[in-house]
Amino acid sequence: ADARQGLRALAAALAAGPDGQPDRPDQADRAPWRARLAGLTAAWRADRDRERASDAVPIAPQRVLAEIEAALRPDDILICDASLASGWGGVYLEQRSSGRRVLSPRGQAGLGYAVPAAIGVAAARPAARVVVLSGDGALGYAAGEMATLTEQALPVTVVVLNNRSWGWIRWYRRINFGRAWEEEDFGDVAFADVARGFGLAAQRVTEPGPLGAALAAALDAPGPALVDVVTEAWQTPITAHRRAVGDGMDGVDRTPAPGYGG
């Protein structure tokens, strides 16, 4: 099928009213609907921007996305790993130019996707800077591929949202069962040290103030780099999670599982 002809036919059909005649202002007044939609959009953007401006410690993932957005150039490419990283990238980063600049494995549920995907993107588009957004759990699946980044001197910056847990599972269990389990929480892995062992330039960031400079330095590095960002464990981009516990995460028991630092 010809996509152009199909789109033209679809546009013609959408321009017609329910009786097949061209839609006219006297047939339907959409102004109230448009006004309501504009109001909801404005309110959502205000909430999003407030969260993105957070100075909280540990660092809010929303702030990380704001800093990434500020650091990206129009031709840069962001690759989000599975689970919460895809949600953070999809909700809190505003794409300001056309084209497929943000990639994620939605529907595939494949943790460890982002670093191997970045290798492919960097090989296919050698002039582009590539940024990986990964949780600490997901990076554990593909940490060995940092050796490939170094061997090929690929311009890939890995940003780790280090919440020291399986974040999605932690939320699911707390919402559905009212408690945490020990296997949800990790020890505090020093990903910057791990990355240096593979030959990457690396920094660990624990407060939001230095985050922008750390990202800029990583993106300007002559080879691959990693920024390990220590983030708040009880943050989520998933609306259903927030609704389950109340907006603002009120009522969530933030106590880590027994014997673990969370």
State each model region's role.
Residues 5-7, 86-87, 109-111, 139-140, ...:
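Short gly/pro/ser/thr-enriched loop/turn and capping motifs at secondary-structure boundaries
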Residues 208, 214-262:
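Glycine/aspartate-rich loop-and-adjacent alpha/beta segment that forms the canonical ThDP
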Residues 9-12, 89-94, 114-116, 143-146, ...:
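Short acidic, glycine/serine/threonine-rich loops at helix termini
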